[in-house]
A protein has these predicted regions:
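N-terminal non-catalytic cap/leader segment that marks the start of a structured domain
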Residues: 1-94, 187, 202, 254
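Catalytic-pocket segment enriched in acidic/His residues
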Residues: 56, 62, 66, 82, ...
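Structural signature of FAD isoalloxazine-binding scaffolds in flavoprotein oxidoreductases
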Residues: 90-107, 122, 252-257
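A structural-propensity feature for long, helix-poor, extended segments
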Residues: 107-127
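Short, conserved beta-strand element in jelly-roll/cupin
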Residues: 127-132, 220
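N-terminal accessory regions of nucleic-acid-interacting proteins
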Residues: 135-149
Length: 269
């Protein structure tokens, strides 16, 4: 099932457009649900259908970020083909870093290219959405902590990361974590085609089957030291082909069973 958050564009701006939760049905309609997406963690289909409010066409809604994570835990080198591209040895354990909640962005929205940066890169990734409080779980137990999967673009100010000697500042600019458009609860995370395009040109084209560490293994490793909250994201690493985006570019990340995350890079004035 594809869950999403959205606003009704037909609601008056003066009254304020409330962020609603819902899912995409088989006919491409957006079905509003009572409560929040995360309320439906482990819910069966009957529980979902009992909480329907009304339906909308996609043309009548504005898609929002599907979650508001307290943190985004990101994984460094996690694709075998990316390691080969960089002439790197396969890591023995995941390399982790964190993007702040202020980096969260949404589908079909602007990414601001910081005026103090000289290079901004795309990194298309599969993201795991945590469904419940998670601490010190095994990989087998981690499967029961996953709400679903979405797309994230781990946008990076590359000149910052190279110049600083560490990643925090270059990964943490406001809006540098577009997420969405949907959370898919039923997919094989290790059998997904992942493609990133810039201005229609394919830059990344790989498969999540190339992952070194599975989402479940990553959750287990991360949860050894930090509590993962419902709605937190784990970005599972990017495939080969990472590169620069120029100002005024359109970047699209597609994962076959989720959809396409599309954003526009605009230079800060």
């Amino acid at each position: 099932m594809k869950f999403l958050k959205f606003k009704n564009k037909r609601e008056s701006l003066n009254e304020g457009r409330e962020i609603k939760s819902g899912f995409l049905d088989e006919d491409g309609k957006v079905v509003e649900l009572k409560g929040d997406i995360l309320d439906y963690f482990n819910a069966d289909i009957n529980a979902v259908l009992e909480n329907i409010v009304e339906s909308y066409s996609l043309e009548d809604i504005e898609i929002e970020s599907p979650v508001n994570p307290s943190k985004i835990v990101c994984i460094g080198l996690n694709y075998r083909d990316h390691a080969k591209e960089m002439n790197e040895e396969l890591p023995e354990k995941p390399t982790i870093f964190i993007k702040p909640s202020t980096a969260v962005n949404k589908d079909d929205n602007v990414i601001i290219y910081p005026k103090i940066s000289s290079r901004v890169d795309y990194e298309g990734e599969l993201a795991t959405v945590i469904g419940k409080e998670t601490k010190q779980v095994s990989p087998e137990e981690a499967e029961n902590c996953i709400f679903g999967y979405t797309i994230i673009n781990d946008v990076t100010a590359r000149d910052f990361t190279l110049g600083d000697g560490q990643w925090t500042r270059g990964k943490s600019c406001d809006g540098f974590a577009p997420i969405g458009p949907y959370i898919e609860t039923e997919l094989d995370p290790l059998n997904q085609r992942i493609v990133t395009k810039v201005n229609g040109e394919t830059r990344q084209n790989s498969s999540t089957s190339q992952m070194i560490f599975s989402p479940q293994e990553i959750i287990s490793y991360v949860s050894e030291t930090m509590t993962l909250n419902p709605g937190d994201l784990i970005a599972t690493g990017t495939p080969p082909g990472v590169g620069e985006m120029k100002a005024d570019s359109i970047v699209e990340v597609t994962i076959e069973d989720i959809g396409t995350l599309k954003n526009y890079l605009i230079k800060e004035e």
